[in-house]
Amino acid sequence: MLRNAFLIFLAVGSYGLLHSLTASHQAKQWVRQHLGEAAFRWYRLAYNVVFTLLLLPLLGLPAALPDRVLYVIHPPWVYVTTALQIAGLALAIDATLRTDLWAFLGLRPEKPAQEAHLVIRGAYRWVRHPMYSGSLLFIWLMPAMTLNTALFYAALTLYIIIGAYFEERKLLAEYGEAYRAYQQKVPMLIPRWPRKP
């Protein structure tokens, strides 16, 4: 188990570190300065393609290691968990559609920071990072869980929490007081129970 945990956390950590470093303002600035605007225009698309391809062997890692089943959720509870997974997917999809989807995919240039606006509609009214919240809800409610998948999801969860922390710093730098006020009103990942009027 310790060997599996080490390999899984190392793989996810390496992927996450590379993913975060290449998404940073510094990396983008380097590409812009050294490769020019024409190359930078396709940076986001290349980034998405490369990290999607790198994700495939990472997803296969838990299956490649010795494993054991922890639990399987049976009816009627599996209907509840599946409904919650669908809700998680809906949350993530809504969040994606509220942003500039084509720019997110890299098919249209991103707007400069000064032209971008803070999105606080839809799923963003409940949590500041609905894509992460929806993804976490989806993975942790899988109807079957093995030891390796639990370790993999734990590593992903840790990466998401750390990534959200650094993303918050970037958003504060971009949006200033508007984002600070948003932070005070809306939780990061777990929605608050609605308050009574």
Regions found by a protein language model. Give the residues of each.
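Hydrophobic transmembrane alpha-helices
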Residues: 4-18, 113-197
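A generic, lipid-embedded transmembrane alpha helix
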Residues: 46-62
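Short, Lys/Arg-enriched, Gly/Pro-containing loop segments at transmembrane-helix junctions
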Residues: 29, 71, 101-109, 172-177
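Membrane-interface loop-to-helix entry segments
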Residues: 47-49, 78-90, 121-135
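Juxtamembrane helix-capping/reentrant segments at transmembrane boundaries
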Residues: 31-50, 74-77, 110-124
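Membrane-helix interface linkers and caps
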Residues: 21-38, 63-72, 170
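Helix-coil boundary and interhelical linker segments in multi-pass alpha-helical membrane proteins
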Residues: 1-8, 59-81, 141-151
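Transmembrane alpha-helical segments that form the membrane-embedded catalytic/substrate-channel core
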Residues: 11-25, 57, 61, 85-106, ...
